[in-house]
């Protein structure tokens, strides 16, 4: 683990998630394909892009339509993905992909998303994302 600005150690996967968010956010902001932004970051990045970062970005890209439909179906009345702040929209995509398509525990993916939202977005974002993503994950679980 590497130290953060606050002096606390930041887990490797947490850093990879943040970097994936940076790439997805940049692509969204600039109107570019996320795969293109990932490629540019991979060629220029120091330190190098971690495989987990690339896996997250590629996974969101490959599953974005399905992820957006899941998130959109669980937004509060009157809300759309486009109404969400860019950071929140991309955090939601990242968390849903990670929770449903990787070996990461769903609770961990949700908690990491909420933590990043509390650091990077509005005061209301952690609560909104927690509620929306908890509903998405609850409904996406296979019936036992």
Which role fits each region the language model picked out?
Residues 1-144:
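N-terminal interaction/assembly modules
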């Amino acid at each position: 683990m590497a130290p953060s600005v606050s002096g606390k150690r930041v887990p490797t996967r947490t850093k990879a998630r943040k970097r994936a968010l940076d790439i997805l956010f940049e692509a969204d902001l600039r109107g570019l394909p996320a795969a293109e932004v990932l490629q540019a970051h991979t060629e220029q990045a120091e330190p190098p892009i971690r495989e987990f970062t690339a896996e997250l970005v590629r996974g969101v890209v490959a599953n974005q339509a399905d992820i957006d439909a899941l998130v959109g179906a669980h937004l509060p009345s009157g809300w759309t993905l486009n109404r969400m702040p860019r950071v929140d929209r991309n955090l939601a995509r990242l968390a849903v992909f990670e929770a449903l398509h990787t070996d990461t525990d769903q609770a961990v993916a949700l908690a990491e998303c909420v933590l990043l939202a509390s650091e990077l977005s509005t005061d209301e974002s952690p609560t909104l994302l927690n509620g929306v993503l908890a509903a998405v994950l609850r409904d996406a679980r296979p019936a036992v």
